[in-house]
Curated annotation (Swiss-Prot):
GO biological process, one term: base-excision repair
Chain intervals annotated as zinc finger (FPG-type): 241-274
Protein name (record): Endonuclease 8-like L720
Statement: the UniProt record of this protein carries the keyword Transmembrane: no
Length: 274
């Protein structure tokens, strides 16, 4: 699954666990956090970009946030769902007997209370402002129901001015401006809008950026619907038109190579995209 719609679907499956208490928690990722989260309450879930966030509260105890990066194949399964061939990285059992299991994900504890700097693969010393910023990032996320078009446009204009000399491929992959957009989505949007991936940001006009934003939103929504159809056993037509294709939809031979500062493998049509 492509990251943005996959994260949204995962969030929709787990958000109902809000306000429930943790009665048991285990797994190698949790053990490396070096905290006791028994009896903590799930205050809220949210997602922004490529992360799902879980805020935990407990009376007279510090507040924590668990951030999950789903990686390429990560999953959070709910209830009786299990992965018999994979070991869970973290398991949380709640007071209503619901069990949450994390698989193949990067799980990090964000601690806004610490005084000394802590940074490992499992614990990061952060600030309350940084956590609030992650909540604000939802407003810029094209896959999020809290997406705010006007705020996004204002934020995007700032980014265009700052990164004018970058190629558009690198800019579309910048999570500060396009949270949740990955390599597949940016390639499809660039083909959809007939824009060369090597084109400089400063050479792309406002109608082109409008096309890119609308195309990204359209593709994300189509992928989301296709995954929902797949879960119910229904068929959904193909969506991706250029990613890893040897020919574009019009039959032109494509180019596939690593480009930009991020060195990401990119496919494009040298005839259709200018």
């Amino acid at each position: 699954m492509v990251e943005a719609p996959r994260i949204r679907i995962t969030y929709e499956k787990i958000r109902h666990t809000k306000n429930h208490r943790i009665v048991s928690i285990s797994g190698p990722s949790y053990k490396r956090m070096n905290v006791d989260l028994i009896d903590y309450i799930i205050r809220k879930w949210w997602f922004a970009g490529k992360y799902i966030y879980l805020m935990l509260i407990s009376s007279n105890k510090p507040t924590y946030v668990i951030r999950t990066h789903m990686m390429m194949h990560g999953r959070i399964l709910v209830g009786n769902q299990d992965s018999p061939t994979k070991r869970a990285f973290m398991i949380i059992q709640l007071d209503n007997d619901i069990v949450l299991r994390w698989y193949r994900s990067q799980i990090t504890l964000l601690d806004p209370n610490c005084l000394a700097e802590i940074k490992t693969n499992y614990t990061i010393c952060t600030t309350r402002q940084a956590i609030m910023d992650s909540i604000k990032l939802m407003k810029y996320d094209l896959s999020n129901n809290r997406f705010d078009y006007n705020l996004f446009q204002s934020h995007l204009k700032n980014g265009i001015n700052i990164h004018s000399s970058e190629i558009i491929t690198d800019f579309l992959l910048d999570q500060e401006y396009f949270p949740g957009v990955g390599n597949i989505l940016q390639q499809e949007a660039l083909y959809d809008c007939k824009i060369l991936p090597l084109k400089k940001v400063q050479d792309i006009d406002e109608p082109m950026f409008d096309c890119l934003c609308n195309s990204l939103k359209k593709i994300i929504d189509l992928l989301y619907e296709s995954y929902k159809f797949r879960e119910s056993g229904k068929e959904f037509g193909p969506i991706l038109r250029i990613y890893r294709k040897s020919l574009c939809p019009l039959g032109h031979k494509t180019i596939r190579k690593k480009i930009g500062l991020r060195n990401r493998m990119t496919t494009w049509c040298p005839v259709c995209q200018l």
